[in-house]
Amino acid sequence: MTVLGALKNIAVGTVGKTTDALRIGNGLDARELQPVGWFAHEQAVEKLRASYAAIPSGENVRLAKKTSNLFRGRNQSTTPGLDVSGLGAVIAVDPVAGTADVQGMCTYEDLVDTVLPYGYSPTVVPQLKTITLGGAVTGLGVESACFRNGLPHEALIEMDVLTGTGEVVTCSPTQNVDLFRGLPNSYGSLGYAVRLKIELEKVKDYVELRHVRFHDVHALTETMEQIVETGEHDGESVDYLDGAVFSLEECYLMLGRQTDEPGPTSDYTRDRIYYRSIQHPEGVLRDRLSIRDYLWRWDVDWFWASRAFGTQNPTIRRMWPRDLLRSSFYWKIIGWDRKYDLADRIEAANNRPARERVVQDIEVTPEHLPEFLEWFFHSCEIEPVWLCPIRIRGTGADGSELVGEGETLGADKEHPWPLYPLTVGQTWVNVGFWSSVPVDLLGKDAPAGAFNKLVEEKVSALGGHKSLYSEAFYDRETFEQLYGGSFPAQLKEVYDPQGRFPGLYEKNVDWA
């Protein structure tokens, strides 16, 4: 190493030690959190009710919430929002029953840090720390336990929902069943979850990982299906299952097994990058993480999206404050980009076309997964993409019915959640891709959102679905065919007759 190189290394190391000493926000490490109790919750609900009453009649009702994990815009409003400032915690934990009562704006980061000391975890922990439990239930949250635990709303025992009438309505599999079944994937068009009672699952201290290399997506898909059906691979049980596709010739399944066996663990919260640790030329690569680090393995680098901010450059990473290696801070950078068009300005300065944001999660069945991946990798240069198999549970852990029959909804064991009708007994594979393409990828005269529209068409042609947390371009007729038909409108007549909340189509396509 040259003298200049040595001096640079010392300087970078010094800056890194200084920034690591800074305590910024929630940081990366576990915090000691206690349930807030019922009295504090009831006070927060009263504040929520008062803020609702203060919104002029005829005005749309929104949350007064600073953070979001939605990748679509929202029309600006000067009307004050709902005060949810006291609704961001766990209310109570019952370690004997394995349940928790949780406020709707509680982030999964806070939920995990509250219940993990009891030896429990939510049944599904979506990938990013600031996703809220209410957001995952009224939207969509997926992760590597979905192949055995279904989706977050399938862990629901009971909910209190602020409806468009200003009432807080309790719903469950046997009470106000239409609302209980209709709130998932409603994205705030019917109301907001104030309290959610959920089942938890026992977890062990560590996760043993096997990263299995494949050279084609057909072989990967076949193995994924076998694991979903059997819960094991090569004689070892599988508790967690997801995948990453870097190209059609380089793809991986990441298999996790819970264990209490002590031993060394890897750390991907500073210099090392988790998704890069997956890559290897052949066979199986093993790794170990603590259970908490496993649950948040994707948050540190926002899967792989942190590369857009320079944090995967070794020099920048060493100097970057450790506490800011988290998706919530990258979201702030995205906010600055949206406000000042930073990315488009950079492209223009380099004589390159502006970019069309392509941030989507879609689901197709395994039989159509290879076709979708082959089409996608031949159509754009976005890589890698994430895979997460999902299996709707249909019944509770004890075999009981998850949902009952409502006044509008009949008993439907195949499609218990009508606004996102994944079929019980059918494996679905979530495919996530979060990047951009040149706006002229499909031609200089291509309309806005051209590639996203092409994705929608391909997914529909394969009988799939698309999550609505990002931009959607469907016409109303197509949208209603895909997302609940007339049922959302029927529910609004009961729970939001004055239309205080924007409708599902208006919220997700028109950005109301």
Protein language model annotation of sequence segments:
Residues 15-17, 21, 25-26, 339-348, ...:
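Activity-critical C-terminal alpha-helical subdomain
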Residues 1-33:
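Intrinsically disordered, low-structural-confidence terminal and linker regions
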